[in-house]
């Protein structure tokens, strides 16, 4: 797979922005300092489809000859790891309803089963259940299917709806990923 370079464009579509913001009021991951005592700040990890920064603690930053980004996390009996705070993809333009209406034939995944990413090649394959979409309408439930693609292709074919809700530490609006393979009954 390709090597990701900071500042390179073409990782996502130009309208994709991904943020890590430890300062969201009442956010589940909000905090003033990371696990190493470094003051935290809002970071646009991806803006306009371009990779801007990594998430790093002191150790990972040193290995890459970068500065820490204030993303150290602590757990009992282990050295500091790396984690996000309130991590989210910003809203897109289309409403959820308009996104569904735009799909001639598709699959709305509401449950993913197992782990299926090859981190060397970027190949992605996962069991799923959800709803079939035909001519812009959700028609019926589907289970025991597999969805597959490649992460590079998925990122480039990803569009976000405008229905972002903050419920967890990691949040995203509904996303449409075009040109994935769907297999099953």
Predicted segments, located by residue:
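Dual-mode signal for accessory low-complexity, basic/Gly-rich regions
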Residues: 2-185
């Amino acid at each position: 797979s390709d090597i990701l370079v900071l500042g390179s464009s073409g990782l996502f579509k130009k309208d994709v922005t991904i943020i890590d913001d430890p300062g969201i009021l009442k956010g589940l991951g909000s905090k003033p300092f990371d696990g190493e005592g470094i003051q935290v700040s809002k970071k646009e990890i991806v803006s306009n489809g371009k990779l801007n920064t990594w998430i790093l603690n002191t150790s990972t930053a040193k290995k890459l000859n970068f500065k820490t980004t204030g993303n150290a996390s602590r757990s009992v009996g282990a050295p500091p790891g790396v984690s996000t705070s309130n991590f989210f993809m910003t809203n897109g333009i289309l409403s959820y309803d308009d996104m569904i209406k735009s799909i001639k034939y598709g699959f709305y995944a509401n449950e993913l089963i197992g782990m299926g990413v090859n981190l060397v090649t970027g190949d992605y394959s996962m069991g799923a259940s959800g709803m079939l979409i035909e001519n812009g309408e959700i028609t019926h439930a589907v289970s025991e299917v597999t969805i597959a693609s490649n992460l590079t292709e998925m990122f480039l074919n990803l569009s976000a709806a405008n229905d972002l809700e903050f419920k967890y530490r990691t949040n995203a609006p509904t996303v449409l990923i075009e040109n994935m393979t769907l297999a099953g009954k």
